[in-house]
Amino acid sequence: MEGEFSNNWNNLNSDGQAGQFNQAGQNLQPGQFNQAGQNLQAGQISQPEQSGLYGTMGQAGYSQPVYTQPMQQEDYRKPMRKAYCRMEWKILVYAAIATVMQVLYSVGLPALFGDDIVNREWYVWGMMILPMYMIAFPLFLLIAGNKDRVQIMQHKMGVGKWLVAVLMCAGICGVGAVIGTLIDTVVSLLCNTSSGDTVTLQNLMLGSNPFFRILTVGILAPIVEEMIFRKTIIDRTVKYGEGVAIVTSGIMFGLFHGNFTQCFFAAGLGILFAYIYIRTGRIRYSISLHMAVNLTTSVVSVGIMQWAGFDQIMAMQDDPVALESMMMDILPKILVVYGWIGILCCLALAGVILIIVSLAKKKFYLVKPPKHVAKGGLTAAWINWGMLLFMLYIIFLFVSNYVNFNL
């Protein structure tokens, strides 16, 4: 229910009964009003009231809520480690199921319908849609279950704040893409090769039908990825500390892309999306932002490049004479492409400025839940066998981009 926490995120009073503490540390009974005039129910934690970028902030500036009632001091690092470990290996199981189903898809369909089927565009996109989104994702939700899950207090995010977040996304994408491209270039030069994922993705996007891009990249991918890396992870780990949950969600999301080109901006976006989800309690906001980013980069930008003939340019790389002739013919269209890139750069710059200003003015803040792990939280989240297996899988993904494994 909106505004309520379930399971283990109930404040306990000195008698061990479900109670509430307002910011002043008062133990409020059901039906009582806090300082802000909120009528709190059992199991509900009052939110501070000063307006911030997302959600609310405390009346005393940006300080955290204070719990003055005697509370049993426990070391929550062990249950925290277990909670993170469970989510990390379950995400690995999702990846394993998707990989196995993709292998079966790539072997089974040509065997049934002939080898020519691999040249059909729907076959290529179907390798993502069917194994990852239609099979592996529902199984992941089933495996994830509801153990340790809490319900985060919900707040509305206005249109203005959503647009501010869009600009921040543009800034993160711009900076992250530059960092990722530079590292990918250096690694490619050292390995005397190019990233397989990057080349494959470029060819797939430039030669694709807009319908498949919108369906897969613009709609399905944001829904599935936000449900896995934001809602599923955070609902089960945020009670041990918002900061660790946000960082872990974002970094795992970035690493899961499996290449340097996308890793850094995806991690940055993941951190921002995780923060927004924790402050609003509504996954639809991060999904809509994720859709906006993907539709802009993979649908609008790619559509403009297709219109300008960049797919034909890619096909003529081995014929310099024909390429030069074509470049002269499509020069006006190329100028339009560069104009679009200029617009994206301006949006990215505005986003970077907004992030810097928001950080300087402390618009981003964290709230300490009752089971917050002050020390050793990051170690508990990252030093466990679930994360070890996840990182081994990630290393394989990154290495396979530059090394051709002949299995």
Name these PLM-found stretches.
Residues 70-129, 192-195, 207-244, 306-308, ...:
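Transmembrane alpha-helical insertion/packing segments
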Residues 98-111, 176-181, 395-404:
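Alpha-helical transmembrane segments of multi-pass membrane proteins
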